[in-house]
Amino acid sequence: EPRTPWDWV
């Protein structure tokens, strides 16, 4: 699945 910046915050 693609990762977005929201996954890292």
From Swiss-Prot:
Annotated tissue distribution: Expressed by the skin glands.
Disulphide bonds in the chain: none
GO-annotated cellular components: extracellular region
Keyword presence, Cytoplasm: no
Job description of the protein: Putative defense peptide.
Keyword Secreted listed: yes
Protein name: Tryptophyllin-4
GO biological process terms, semicolon-separated: defense response
Locations listed in the record: Secreted
Keywords in alphabetical order: Amphibian defense peptide, Secreted
Organism: Ascaphus truei (Coastal tailed frog)
Membership in a protein family: Belongs to the frog skin active peptide (FSAP) family. Tryptophillin subfamily.
